[in-house]
Curated annotation (Swiss-Prot):
SUPFAM superfamilies: Fibre shaft of virus attachment proteins (SSF51225), Virus attachment protein globular domain (SSF49835)
Induction details: Expressed in the late phase of the viral replicative cycle.
Record organism: Human adenovirus B serotype 7 (HAdV-7)
Subcellular location: Virion; Host nucleus
Record-given protein name: Fiber protein
Pfam family, one: Adeno_knob
UniProt keyword annotation of Nucleotide-binding present: no
GO cellular component, one term: host cell nucleus
This protein's domain notes: The tail region anchors the fiber to penton base capsomers, whereas the shaft, built from several repeated motifs, allows the knob to protrude from the virion.
Amino acid sequence: MSNFNSSPVPTIFMSFFQMTKRVRLSDSFNPVYPYEDESTSQHPFINPGFISPNGFTQSPDGVLTLKCLTPLTTTGGSLQLKVGGGLTIDDTDGFLKENISAATPLVKTGHSIGLSLGPGLGTNENKLCAKLGEGLTFNSNNICIDDNINTLWTGVNPTTANCQIMASSESNDCKLILTLVKTGGLVTAFVYVIGVSNDFNMLTTHKNINFTAELFFDSTGNLLTSLSSLKTPLNHKSGQNMATGALTNAKGFMPSTTAYPFNVNSREKENYIYGTCYYTASDHTAFPIDISVMLNQRALNNETSYCIRVTWSWNTGVAPEVQTSATTLVTSPFTFYYIREDD
């Protein structure tokens, strides 16, 4: 058996050892990137341990380059930023700046783009919105007329007496149901009374009687309850009830002082509206009631800017009810119209 240590090394292993020997760099090799050999201008294939693949790559092998993703690029050996139509590079200071022009209704102020708003537009919670004036509202994102704001009333049927008509009464003796609705330049008025106190209902036992509800208003159209027969303020409609908020301006519901002036005797007849309503007696007989409406004409004091007086009267051969069978006095509704004051 031959000794292994004395055997010659096979040629194939010798070649492998020679190939794996570290190549000796020339004395002119520059160890600073790009690692050129000054004598040959060659890039030796090296991969220093301080080069991270994060942000760098070798392309081709041995040549260190940057990894660039849009909007970065390299053009002519320089790292550059791709800019679109809205950006540019300032030639003076090299700063990146916007290159945007604004067309109407957009406006550019400094570095901000804004929207020029005209009447009827505004912002709410950073959203563009339409401004709605009094009488308009949104319904399912559509603009519509707020019918409630065009109505001023006592409600459908007050739960308790709200009006004191009889001079002998020390408290409210009836319910006055009044509705005023603005319709263009006119107001449509709807009125009737329901008796509450026994004294008021006993009026039906008289053959000749009249009673008046006086309504006095200030310059904004608010009812002066201390002076008026109606002791509860009017308010806008909210469903079948009165709105609960304060009434700010009801001037547009008032009778026009131009059409129905105060204290002008020569035009006194213009201030009156006449008509007929009815009382249905216990035996179902319909008794006619004369009704007259006086608009403005006489002011009670300096507080009064507008007034409406409604008078009911009858003069019949027999009383609607006999003395011992007085029932609730309910007049049928009466509708009338008048020219309204400007809002």
